[in-house]
Amino acid sequence: MSMLAPLRLVREPWNASEGNQSNATAGAGGAWCQGLDIPNELFLTLGLVSLVENLLVVAAILKNRNLHSPTYYFICCLAVSDMLVSVSNLAKTLFMLLMEHGVLVIRASIVRHMDNVIDMLICSSVVSSLSFLGVIAVDRYITIFYALRYHSIMTLQRAVVTMASVWLASTVSSTVLITYYRNNAILLCLIGFFLFMLVLMLVLYIHMFALACHHVRSISSQQKQPTIYRTSSLKGAVTLTILLGVFFICWGPFFFHLILIVTCPTNPFCTCFFSYFNLFLILIICNSVVDPLIYAFRSQELRRTLREVVLCSW
């Protein structure tokens, strides 16, 4: 996966010479600095699983008119973003395998153009995926705190504008990232975007969890059943931990990698961290696999429609 143009910088900082990197890496920690050799088959397998999962989500939402609402449209867009992550990963891996085995022989200029197209798709899907995770969090927040006004706040027109804005911004940002990938300011913007989404989700989901605990506590005190409060609080805490934990675990290492690229590109310990770049890509692809389980498959209506889709009862 090292052909990624903007992520080529991410993997091997342009302002650190190859010699400095290898020497620093060798002196920093020995064997554990050699990185992790991840087979292409794992990239292909995870990409295929994610592609199938997210295709099913999109098909189910399109099929069932009961799911034609802003909330499910946002989930559908997240599935499309994750699907693009999978497709770009599959294309990249297959492209590399065919070239490595001599099956595909292409001029270097064409390879660069194809590489840039795939890179743009990857960057756009990463930005849009992060964006729709934030949009879904905001949508859930409005659903809980402004339930009576939800349909007047989140109209179909506003939902369409939101989705179009995210896709447009993702396309523009990916183009800028591909063009100016050697500029640290671009990486800082990407890091800032991730931190903003992380803080946004933390604040919104914790506030929602606090409100849920308050409601359950008041109900249990009226019914004099503290067990209800403890059970519901535990379930809410588990859900919150899963939501934020998956987001942080899957995306955190990659963006921490970006932070190190900007702050210490030649530091021996940083170069050790850089050697695990493929692992961070695997975690991002894993996020595309897990997203449908968290945001889509928990809906009973969507699960029922998925069964119909799988059984081809259109």
Curated annotation (Swiss-Prot):
Its main location: membrane. Signal peptide: none annotated. Residues 1-35, 92-116, 182-189, 264-276 are extracellular. The chain crosses the membrane at residues 36-61, 71-91, 117-138, 162-181, 190-209, 238-263, 277-297. Pfam families: 7tm_1. It is a multi-pass membrane protein. Glycans are attached at N15, N20, N23. GO terms for molecular function: melanocyte-stimulating hormone receptor activity. Belongs to the G-protein coupled receptor 1 family. This is Melanocyte-stimulating hormone receptor. The lineage of its organism: Eukaryota, Metazoa, Chordata, Craniata, Vertebrata.
